[in-house]
Amino acid sequence: MSNLQLSPMRKTIVGVQFLFVAFGATVLVPLLVGLDPATALFTAGLGTFIFHLVTKGKVPIFLGSSFAFITPIISASKQWGMPGTLAGIAGVALVYFVMSALIKWQGKKLLDKLFPPVVIGPVIILIGLSLSKAAVDMAKTNWLIAFISLGTAVTVLSMGRGLMKLVPVICGIAVGYSVAALMGIVNFSGVEAAPWFALPPALAHFQLPQFAWEPFLYMIPVAIAPVIEHVGDVYVVSAVADKDFTKSPGLHRTMLGDGLACLAACFFGGPPVTTYSEVTGAMSITKVTHPQVIRIAAATAIVFSVIGKLSALLQSIPSAVLGGIMLLLFGTIASVGIQNLIQHKVDLNQTRNVIIISVTLTVGIGGAVLTWGNFTISGIGLSALVGVILNLILPQTEVEKTEEEKEA
């Protein structure tokens, strides 16, 4: 079913489903760093709307709490307190703004030179595979529940028709949650204690961030890895939606939107936000990539942030239920990376291509970490950086040079 054939009701249902996919990670980050989950939901929704405004409503991306800043926020809050640390997130926004201006200045030729398919393909694969450990960790808390959730989602996706085929995630979560409740492993105490309506604490008791240079400068190098991951995520979404969002509206706009969303998040007391691969995976399996559906997910996040019992109900979903669903979603992202390599006819008989792909994947899967003073880069950011450097320094064959000149 195409995006154009979706009725408003179906768009709403799929949009709510996308929030279910993003909910777990969005509220987990604030819990780990000592921030309020309801505020994180609010800033995720607000940040997504800001992103869509800047990108002219063209790019189907959902922004949620970023895991990349968990350790830096915990460390910085011990030195400068949480208000000062959140103000330091402005340094993250600055990095996005600078990169946006650089890409706008140099144009798409710079992107094509730094991120050809031989680099982007393995980076997309790693975005999926790097999340697989989190999926397994969640699923292994109760494999029976995880496989029930996964099996339900796969069955609906494979055999469903009409509306059912669009909601495999909701079906998987609903069945898994019901079985978990019958087994007595769902804790409803949070739902009972939660108020029906309550503003997020950061909004009810709003305080301006306390700006200081120290946390601002501390956060700047931390932002490099998320910025590199942002590029990979935009390429993933482009592949899933079959549209080149690096051309229209342009990567400079997606960078600017992400930066402004981070700025808004810290202003309202939430964690920094980033593009969410979980939602991209859900788009890939449902084939629904309409940006309006993502905006429905963002609006739902804001609504849930003020309806305490709904938010608490989602927080009561066992990790195993979400883990089972993530096993499907994250694997789907990795398959998009493989498809990207095939679609662009990357020749694996070329030694140069084999080297770039092999080293990029090994660095990412192996968990390599590069530390220089207070600066640390790892994961997707480091892998993408290694891929870019190898692509620039390894000599091309005459055939590759000719093909590149034709594309230019």
Regions found by a protein language model. Name each.
Residues G24-V27, G151-V156, V167, N187-W196, ...:
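Juxtamembrane interface elements at the cytosolic ends of transmembrane helices
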Residues Q79-V191, A298-E404:
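Membrane-embedded alpha-helical modules
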Residues P72-W80, L157, V279-I294, T300-S305:
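Interfacial segments of multi-pass membrane proteins
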Residues S2, L6-M9, G34-H52, K58, ...:
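Membrane-embedded helical hairpins/re-entrant loop segments and their flanking transmembrane helices
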Residues V16-F20, F115, V119, K140, ...:
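Hydrophobic alpha-helical transmembrane segments of multi-pass membrane proteins
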Residues M1-I61, A68-Q79:
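N-terminal signal-anchor module of multipass membrane proteins
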Residues L35-L41, G57-F69, L111-I120, K165-I170, ...:
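Short, non-helical or kinked segments that cap or interrupt transmembrane helices
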Residues T12-A22, I145-S149, V167-P168, P200-D233, ...:
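Hydrophobic, membrane-embedded alpha-helices of multi-pass small-molecule transporters
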